[in-house]
A protein has these predicted regions:
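Substrate-binding cleft/loops of secretory-pathway carbohydrate-active enzymes
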Residues: 207-308
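Substrate-binding cleft of secreted/luminal carbohydrate-active enzymes
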Residues: 258-262, 270-381
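Aromatic-lined substrate-binding rim segments of carbohydrate-active enzymes
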Residues: 78-164, 233-252
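Extracellular/luminal regions of secreted and cell-surface proteins that mediate adhesion/ECM remodeling
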Residues: 372-493
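Conserved, mostly hydrophobic/aromatic
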Residues: 91, 193, 206, 244, ...
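Boundary/entry segment of secreted carbohydrate-active catalytic domains
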Residues: 2-96
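Hydrophobic faces of well-ordered beta-strands that scaffold small-molecule active sites
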Residues: 57-59, 89-93, 127-131, 204, ...
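Active-site groove signature of glycoside hydrolases
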Residues: 158-182, 186-227
Length: 493
């Protein structure tokens, strides 16, 4: 897949829209007669923390080192402390393959995985996962021993030099041969995971993972690859992507937009992922402009997960730039520029709730602001009321998005009553409402139902891969504990 500009690029229509609502035009007078000249209700933007599918600050439970081991704390205490960090609405783990499978045909999870999944239900914070096939920051191989018995390892051209006290500079980062055994074991592992977690309440997203360091599709700074040809490399990577896409039918996949440095066809995986309605991520922000173009000009229905470390390797040093700005705050400002749905709460190779709190206490403003803007924050800024010739009432919702990102899927609006006598609605086009502008959509009320009844409420949901998730209305007033909005006239005219 050649490099291309992402602005205006044709990635297809995006996710299917079921029960599409009428979204205009809305002429006020003859011959249209929508009579939307007078506003019935208005809302103002809220500042509450929003926890819903497709967005949020995401606390890292594990990065490259597996279990977050902190002296003086049990593993449960450490993970619980990370879950309790108030700004985080999701968590993330990045285990090595050997941490979840020890033998063929069966998954056996390390304790930190099991604790994380249990606490995700306890705290209502879903989990993003990536299973690494190759990890440069450990000396042992990320692959399980039973896989290594059938899969040769190969050295690529080049070397990676740096501080010899760091593990990544102490070995040669051998790459596995992508033979039939590896592909077969990979498919088995994906199917076993999906059998347990596909569509379950614990999982938010799954990273695609295949060739290279961290499974991101590159082996920088090493040159080339260990495939017979570039064509074979692309075919193998697409095969691994297709295995994941087939297994995870109810969970969005997330592909890193890392440039195709080793010419293995990773760019084709990115393209396929977008066309299939999946999402994107980037694990460094102040880097290649190719990645920045992709993320900032992606289709509105594609979520963007930005990863950045808030501190240095020991978790307590906070680098500043030449102008004196904390590097973490600089990254956050660029995360907003990239219209991010997710951002990592990550203290690099020193994952520890104490380190997370220490950074937050020193630099609270940028994180607080991001928590109130990350992702999408939808509400009906205007609600107009009109009537059909047969007397049935219409509500026209002027939907706005006070966040920084589009809706990564399809937004469904439903007008309902608590007693179930009214339940009617439908969907906006994929990705709407965008962060700027208004998306108008009309819902016709059942015969005999009036907006003035005082019983009507508006509920929002996001549909991702055919699964619906509740979306709280992000308004400053009139919002119920379940996230719905009371439909009550508050505009006189």
């Amino acid at each position: 897949m050649p490099v291309h500009n992402w602005t205006g690029y044709d990635f297809g229509p995006g996710p299917a829209v079921r029960d599409r609502l009428y979204q205009g035009p809305f002429g006020c007078y003859e011959p249209d007669n929508f009579y939307g000249g007078w506003c019935y209700q208005s809302t103002q933007p809220g500042k509450q923390l929003i926890n819903c599918m497709g967005m949020g600050l995401i606390t890292y439970i594990s990065g490259d080192f597996g279990a977050p081991l902190v002296p003086g704390k049990t593993l449960e205490e450490t993970i619980d402390g990370l879950f309790r960090f108030p700004l985080g609405t999701k968590v993330y783990i990045r285990p090595n393959w050997r941490h979840i499978q020890k033998r063929e045909g069966k998954l056996e999870f390390d304790d930190y995985w099991k604790i994380t999944m249990e606490m995700s239900l306890q705290y209502d914070k879903r989990v993003g996962i990536r299973v690494m096939l190759n990890n440069p920051d450990i000396l042992e191989n990320a692959l399980p021993d039973f896989v290594l018995k059938k899969v040769p390892l190969h050295k690529l051209k080049g070397s990676w030099t740096g501080n010899p006290s760091q593990v990544r500079y102490q070995h040669e980062h051998l790459q596995p041969e992508y033979n039939d055994y590896l592909i077969g074991y990979f498919e088995e592992m994906q199917n076993l995971l999906a059998e347990q977690y596909n569509g379950g309440p614990e999982i938010e997203m799954v990273d695609t993972h295949h060739f290279g360091l961290w499974g991101e599709g590159h082996a920088w700074p090493y040159d080339g690859h260990n495939f017979k040809s570039r064509k074979e490399a692309e075919e193998k990577l697409l095969k691994m992507y297709e295995i994941q896409q087939k297994a995870w039918t109810k969970v969005p996949l997330v592909t890193n937009v890392q440039p195709d440095y080793n010419r293995v066809g990773h760019s084709s995986v990115i393209d396929r992922s977008v066309r299939d309605g999946n999402w994107l991520r980037r694990d460094s922000i102040l880097v290649q402009n190719e990645c920045i173009d992709a993320l900032s000009n992606r289709p509105a229905w594609v979520a963007n997960f930005c990863e950045g470390a808030m501190s240095s390797g020991n978790g307590t040093d906070y680098p500043v730039d030449a102008d004196g700005f904390a590097r973490g705050d600089v990254i956050i400002s660029h995360v907003k520029d990239l219209k991010a749905n997710y951002y990592s709460l990550w203290t690099f190779h020193a994952i520890n709730p104490d380190n997370l709190w220490a950074y937050y206490k020193k630099y609270p403003d940028a994180l607080n602001d991001l928590a109130q803007r990350i992702g999408f924050r939808v509400r009906p800024s205007w609600i107009w009321r009109s009537s059909d010739p047969d007397g049935r009432e219409n509500l026209i919702f002027g939907m706005v998005n006070d966040g920084i990102a589009g809706v990564p899927g399809v937004l469904r609006l439903t007008v309902f009553t608590d007693d179930g006598s009214v339940e009617t609605g439908g969907c906006l086009d994929a990705g709407f409402p965008h962060p700027k502008g208004i998306r108008e959509a009309m819902i016709t009320l059942p015969e005999g139902v009036s907006a003035n009844s005082g019983r009507l409420k508006l509920r929002a949901e996001i549909e991702v891969k055919g699964v619906r998730y509740p979306v709280p209305i992000a308004a400053a007033h009139g919002v119920n504990p379940d996230g719905s909005l009371n439909i009550i006239r508050n505009v006189n005219g």
